[in-house]
Structures are given as structure tokens and as C-alpha cells.
């Protein structure tokens, strides 16, 4: 029997653990010189006040290796095989750290989601179909699916991407002056998928991207802080796609800090080539 762990880069909330049948390893967040455990002792209100009103940019770091080792070892002692699905190794050191931590334990398998947030949720739903299979079998299934998952998001402002070091000064200045909306893609690494002028064009880009969506898997609608942009996007999206959407995902602080408030987007599985 397999027990599934994810890190909080999955944006699976503590109250959703039973829904997804997972255990959560919280990333660490340093905010105003205080360390928090993502999704555990940092409320959304405190986080967004710091981000919006105080213009404090949080720093994120790996889950506690000591706590992770203790929790995973306990599951192994109870007779479980353990599958850990991590945020993409291209944007966090979590995957490599956990691979090293459990490199000599054949009862533990660490899988790179190649994504984050909704992408991990999709992988968790898939993994839950195979809890009585071997770790080798499940890993192969997830790796194949992970390579097809893409997250597309539109930040309301470029300021947070700039402050987080993910956007150069020149690109930030030009984009801000021209009101350019970059559509950011997370598919293993973070890239600019497209550049459009204005919010309506950004929404049209996201909707058109769904033409390459594999409708056998869920779409995860995602946002930060304010639902308005996402609600408008969904209202413009064809019903065939709305019908396979799961619950709206208000991104956890560890991810939301890079996008800023009022970002929105879709996470989905692309069709096989």
C-alpha cells in the first residue's frame, strides 16, 4: 500500500488532506524576520497584508528535513511504501534534497512534478488510482503524465515578478509602460509563453490554449487573493472545459508571493503529441 506525500508547493491546504489522501510537507517562509510553515501558521490575511500593504517580499526555503525524515520513516515502519511528489526541481531545491535524504531507502520514491500547485493536484489524483501497485509502476505513470502538464498564469502586475528576481529591469519597465500582460508558463521551468496587451487579450490567450487540453483529466482554475479575474475568465470559457474543472485554487503563500495578488490562470494536461 502506498502513502502519498506532497510539499506545500502543491497548494493543497491542510483541510484538504483527506480529500486528496495526502500528507503535506510545508515549505518554510521567512516574512518580516519570522519563519513560518507554509499553510500551517501563516494566515492568508497576514501574508497578503505584508505583500500588498507593507510591500514585504517573503523568502521561501525547503521543508524541514528532520521533520520529513521522521514522518516518512514512521509510515515506512507502519508498512507503507511512500511516494513523495515535489514541486518542480527547476524552481525549488526540495526535490533534490529529498532524493538525497532517501537515496538509500527503496521504500521511498521521490517524483518530480515538473510543475507546482494544480499540476501536483492532477498527479495526486492519478496516483490515488494506483495505491496498491508498486512504486516503480506509479513513478512511470506519473513521469509520463507530468511531462504533459502545463500551468499558464497571468499576473496583474509585473512588480512581484521583478521583486522576486524573475524579471529584468528593462522588461519590467517596458512591460509596465505598454501595459503588456505576459502569460507565464510553468512546464518544468518558468517561461514566458506569450505577451499580449490588456486583460481581455490575456484571457483570450488562456481560453485558446485549452484547445490543446486533454479532457480526460481535470482543469485546475487558480488565482491569488482576489477571485474577480478568474471568475470572469471562467465565464468566458466554453462549457466543455468548465465541466471538467475542479475547485478553484487560491494559491498558498509559497507560490503566491511570486505572482502577487489578482493573478489567475489554468493548469491542465496537454494532449498527447
Predicted region positions:
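A generic structural signal for short
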Residues: 1-2, 36, 60, 86, ...
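Class I S-adenosyl-L-methionine
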Residues: 35-104
